[in-house]
Amino acid sequence: DLGSSTKEGGECSFKSLEAATSDLASNKIDVLVTAPINKDNIQSDGFDFPGHTEYLAKLSNVDNALMFMCSDNLRVGIVTGHIPISKVAQTLTQENILAKIVQMNASLIQDFVINRPKIAVLGLNPHAGEKGLLGDEEKDIIAPAVKRASEMGILAFGPYPADGFFGSTGYKKFDAVLAMYHDQGLIPFKALTFGQGVNYTAGLPIVRTSPDHGTAYDLVGRGTASLSSFQSAVFLARDVYLNRAFQKEVSLTPLK
């Protein structure tokens, strides 16, 4: 069964995840770096989630963790996460977009030590709705959420049309980008950084990272798989852990 999905493989994946999260909870380890899972064969009575992000959020008693794809030159967060695209528009609200902006801003400060991060927010519709011609979500939901974030002192801008934003390298002017749905954010992220990117779960009390690729059964036994993304995930987990420790120390011993 080498290189194929099996029930036993899914069971082993979940047992490994349980053991790791148990060690994390008992402070035997400091960070969690997860390998890719098969989201289908891991499903069981103990794991009824679309992915690691939702499982770890539930385990940590966090309502709304942020899926945050990170590389040296690009960071992309996702508002709606692992849901069918047919449900994206109905899921978007001012409140959940604002919550993600606030969460992203806090992570950039605490986890990446960026004092005044600049956040770009993407639109949902083609050309960011063209002032309502191609959809109302931008003017009715997204733009008001961005305005509310700005009123809170967060440097949030948008909504920007996703295609032109990445095509013109506009992302380079910002510390992070907030996409409305999974593929809107992950397609450009992986196209620009594949092999170097990391999936980071922001908003958790623990530090968790993962490589930006899947199980890649087709590469099993060939000796051609790259370790670079997993290596980047290990390094980012270490960096975030140290950054959090630094921020905590600074807050406890402020300059007088």
PLM feature segments, named:
Residues 53-64:
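A glycine-rich helix N-cap at a beta->alpha junction
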Residues 55, 67, 76-78, 206-208:
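Conserved hydrophobic/aromatic beta-strand scaffold that supports enzyme active sites
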Residues 69-99:
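Ligand-binding beta-strand-loop-alpha-helix segment within the catalytic cores
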Residues 68-69, 113:
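Short beta-strand
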Residues 1-52, 95-180, 184-191, 195-199, ...:
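Contiguous, glycine/small-aliphatic-enriched amphipathic segments in soluble metabolic enzymes
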Residues 66-67, 109:
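Short beta-strand/turn micro-motifs at beta-sheet edges
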